[in-house]
Amino acid sequence: MGGDAFTFELFGLTFNWTNLISGTIVFVITFFLLFGLSRHLQMKPTGGQNVLEWIVEFTNGIVRGQMPSETSGFYSFFVFVLFVFLFISNQLGLIIQFGWNGHEIVKSPTADPVVTMTLALCAVTLSHFAGVARQGVKGYFADYFKPFSLMFPIKLVEEFSNFLTLGLRIFGNIYAGELLLKLLAGMAFSHGIPTMIVSLPLEIIWQGFSVFIGAIQAYVFVTLTTVYISRKVTGE
């Protein structure tokens, strides 16, 4: 378990098999989970429909809390899917970690900075498109010079720092959690029964804590995404 990422080259470009496989697993789990929860919808929800409606209300609450009412509905579905995808991505490495010949094959996609920075780039780019669509090109760029022109370089630094912190925060938490689980698993088999007795309870406790951390990081990511979009839409 663990090791270097499994990569291959195509047309001079290097592709990461680990991220492709792990991401595909997350997509499949997300699709079938939402498909299963949304089957047999009724006016009086029961079972899986209750869970689905709770998640929808939860993410809708995030959007409504950050965005003006006239635009919140447009981004509700995006935030819902993003939250579910991130939550499952954060938990995948706690359920499945598989390696072969010194290479990682399956892990949490969000334990790789390339994945999290790409998601952060998509979120920040969407916020800029939303700002242009709402305010127009002139109004969008005018915000960078408010309340006075000297704010322009400061706001550029702020934009870059928002991008970095959004992607690195979730990566750091998920990567650190999985790394500690690997260390505890290695310690369990290092000196036989004594270390196994000590490390196994610690690993169970840390896995439970990592589930909580993964949920919090998914919540933080989607909340900050809605904040960034709201700022561009409202011009604040």
Curated annotation (Swiss-Prot):
Gene3D superfamilies: ATP synthase, F0 complex, subunit A
Subcellular location: Cell membrane
GO cellular component: a single term: plasma membrane
Record SUPFAM superfamilies: F1F0 ATP synthase subunit A
Coiled coil: none
Keyword Cytoplasm belongs to the record: no
NAD listed as a keyword: no
Bilayer disposition of the protein: Multi-pass membrane protein
GO terms of molecular function: proton-transporting ATP synthase activity, rotational mechanism
Membrane-traversing stretches: 17-37, 76-96, 113-133, 170-190, 196-216
HAMAP family: ATP_synth_a_bact
Name the UniProt record assigns to this protein: ATP synthase subunit a
Gene that specifies this protein: atpB
